[in-house]
Amino acid sequence: MGMIAGIDLGTTFSALAILNKIGRPEVVPNSEGERLTPSVVYFDEDQDATVRVGIEALNCRQLNPDRAIRWIKRHMGDSQWRKTFGERVWTPEEISSLILKKLKQDAEMIYPNIQHVVISVPAHFDEVRRKATMDAGAMAGLNVIGIVNEPVAAALYYATTHDVNGRVLVYDLGGGTFDVTIMDVSGQNIQIVCNQGDHALGGVDFDRKILQMFEKTYQEQTGQPLITNSQEQAQYEDEAEDVKKTLSRRPVAKKILYGKAGSARVEITQAQFEEAVEPLV
């Protein structure tokens, strides 16, 4: 029997893991040597719309953000979502399959015998989204033998390293989706009590609150908008994420904003950020 891998097909990052020789989970590094692969796909402007996936796609996004696809997980199972590049129309499942294919191909450089996969999904995913995830795996050439709820996967891993018995709450706020699950755990036996979530709430929405603060500050200081095109949008989305990370470590983040009307200085405190995101939490 071939090796079984577990895949976290995330909104912002994805990863593939296997059980190593001593039975411990091990995240397999990608071809860039990183354990996390950005869930980004970029289509070149050539006639064939050459596809780039992962960090390469993320870097190319600054060149032409309109040809980059991010956060595709939010559209899984949406029959109305379509994007055209070159002469081909792409569905969310087909975009996701490109990410899954890269994960598998990169992992097979180290473990060439991966034949089956289990893919984790948000607990609140309905059957349409779950089937779409399995379809994406099949398009990537994977034999998807199972779908597991992300909070259950987290609890299973925790149970392998800790003595857990009782009722457990798993709070899973990811890059683009949110789950809260209550479960009864006894060793590695898990029974779901209830779960709730939002497939359109995650870290990216916190970034957007900071982006709004950027825009407000810049307009107050210059009288002009900060963001006027998709390239500037992409640039400041990344800078907003950097500020969010800074505020997780420090009480204040400072940045100079450069726009067509000149520069503006912005300072955001943890308290200001918490107030801005309070409606989300």
Predicted regions and their residues:
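Oxyanion-binding/catalytic loops of NTP- or PPi-dependent enzymes
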Residues: M1-H75, S79, T84-V89, E108-V281
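Short, well-ordered amphipathic alpha-helical segments that serve as non-catalytic structural scaffolds
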Residues: S97-D106
